[in-house]
UniProtKB/Swiss-Prot annotation:
This is Probable transcriptional regulatory protein YrbC. Keywords: Cytoplasm, DNA-binding, Transcription, Transcription regulation. It comes from Bacillus subtilis (strain 168). The keyword Cytoplasm applies. GO terms for biological process: regulation of DNA-templated transcription. It holds the Pfam family TACO1_YebC_N. PANTHER family: TRANSCRIPTIONAL REGULATORY PROTEIN YEBC-RELATED, TRANSLATIONAL ACTIVATOR OF CYTOCHROME C OXIDASE 1. The gene is yrbC. It is found in: Cytoplasm. Belongs to the TACO1 family. GO terms for cellular component: cytosol.
């Protein structure tokens, strides 16, 4: 029976991993759909689509799933139509929270997001209530432990590529760009350096502090939101 129990545990874990992977692929498919719908189905002519395809491949999303999402956006397949919508609100201790969604039913999504806030010490706010606390930026990190890097040379490379700022952390170099220059900076740097991560994201320009109890509630709120099929990204201005 012990062997049978072990097999059941392995199978349960595998099923959970499969479900998690399926959720990731579904969210990526929505992101691909929106990028293709807004900028066209040709990745060569659509930088947003090109970047999300790269992101999807990095998550080992099958090519047929990627192609299906693009064809759907181009009108080659029937199905639901998705749109982007961002919700803003306050978490525990007044921490600013932004929730980026892609949905085919705004009423359902708004209800789910509002419930998540209400049940976890927060409140959903009006559009614009916290957006001013964030700025959309290209954000690239470079591993500084893998090999020796001349910081002056890296700074020059960042600026010449069109980057905005270089920050030095303990294990990483952080490169900031305007969103429109993100891809060219990333392409220039990855030919010479080991890039750990690269994304266009929302970065806080003001940070909030919170006690342990509020942080625990905030983490639960983020988990609940991220588990929602319609939610793509959750941003906060909490300083960890």
């Amino acid at each position: 029976m012990a062997g049978h129990s072990k097999w059941k545990n392995i199978q349960k874990r595998k099923n959970a991993q499969d479900a998690k992977r399926g959720k990731i692929f579904m969210k990526l498919a929505k992101e691909i759909y929106v990028a293709a719908k807004e900028g066209g189905a040709d990745p060569e002519a659509n930088s947003a689509l090109r970047l999300v395809i790269e992101k999807a491949k990095g998550a080992n999303m099958p090519n047929e799933n990627i192609d299906r999402a693009i064809k759907k956006a181009a009108g080659g397949q029937d199905g639901s139509s998705y749109e982007e919508i961002t919700y803003e609100g306050y978490g525990p201790s007044g921490i600013a929270v932004m929730v980026e969604c892609v949905t085919d039913n705004k009423n359902r999504t708004a209800s789910n997001v509002r419930t998540a806030f209400n049940k976890n010490g927060g409140s959903l706010g009006e559009s614009g209530c916290v957006a001013f606390l964030f700025e959309r930026k290209g954000f690239i990190t470079i591993d500084r432990t893998e090999r020796q890097i001349e910081e002056d040379e890296l700074m020059l490379d960042v600026l010449e590529a069109g980057g905005e700022e270089l920050r030095i952390e303990e294990d990483l170099y952080e490169v900031f760009t305007e969103p429109e220059h993100f891809e060219e900076v990333k392409t220039a740097l990855e030919s010479k350096y080991l890039i750990s991560s690269a994304e266009v994201t929302m970065l806080p320009n003001t940070y909030a502090e919170a006690d342990d109890q509020a942080v625990e509630k905030l983490e639960t709120l983020i988990d609940v939101l991220e588990d929602d099929d319609d939610v793509q990204e959750v941003y906060t201005n909490y300083r960890s």
